[in-house]
Amino acid sequence: MASRPNAASVEAEAAAALARLRSALDAAFATVPHSAAPSESQSADFARLMRAALTQAAAEDTLLTPAQCEGAANGYRRHLLIADPQGRYAAAALVWQPGQASPVHGHRTWCGYAVLDGALRETLYAWDEATEHAQPLRTQAREAGAVSYVRAGLNAIHRLANDGARPAVSLHVYGVAGEHIATGVNRLVTARH
């Protein structure tokens, strides 16, 4: 019979996996010296490296502790995992119970996410300047391992939802300091359905 890992070893494995994620995120920022946000000319390399960091993290079975996979009944729950000491980025695990969804939103900063466990439904929207509303474009399933990265603005309005019967967990990295992860990321918009 295989023994279950003790809490200390689970914590140590998660810390090591998060250290690898931090290292990969820092490597992405090495492509944008002297700036907390990539310029247009730097964004392709930065985006590629962010996607690679998220893909690598999604493959880590030990990235999160059991406590970091706990949800909440009243809405999706964020667990802050990494707050860059220079304020360039913050990473969080979001836990989605069945039926929970984000509001329709664009972003005040660049962001990327990876689905770690379960599945999410992502609805993409186009911004209509004339009506100042978001118009639904398409919906796509985002299974475990799916990765996305977008720049700031209203060019990537979306809504994530857990339509499944079990919880889902996703990893999000945002271009904000850790203390701004709840207020400095999403730009809520009104959608027409």
Where are these regions (language model features)?
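N-terminal leader/capping segments at the start of a protein or of a new domain
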Residues: 1-60
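A short glycine-rich, His/Asp/Glu-containing loop-to-beta-strand
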Residues: 69-98
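Conserved short histidine dyad/triad with adjacent acidic residue
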Residues: 92-106, 153-155
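Glycine- and acidic-residue-biased ligand/ion/polar-headgroup-sensing regions
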Residues: 109-125
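Asparagine-centered strand-capping/turn motif at beta-strand->loop junctions
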Residues: 159-164
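Mixed-charge, glycine-accented linear interaction segment located at domain edges/termini
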Residues: 183-186
